[in-house]
Amino acid sequence: MSWALDEFLSSVEEEFGVDIEDAEQLDTPGAVIDYVAATTKAQDGMDEEEHRDHVAAIVGELMARTLGVTRYREDWRFVEDLRVR
């Protein structure tokens, strides 16, 4: 895994207080979003969909900051489609 992707996943762990043990399985932005949404609790009365949207927004900000990626689809793969090296 690239240092940039490691940095991104570390920032996700820090931001959400989650442990990402099997990073190889999280090969798309959508997989990261789903993992975080499933392992964290919704706050402030959010339902599941609102919680996932909230997580997606933060993950998008972290991707922009650590990877320089600002436009993506959730099913795009980090290495092959987004060219994260």
Task: Kindly label every feature range from the protein language model.
Residues 1-85:
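Phosphopantetheine-dependent thiolation modules in NRPS/PKS and related acyl-activating systems
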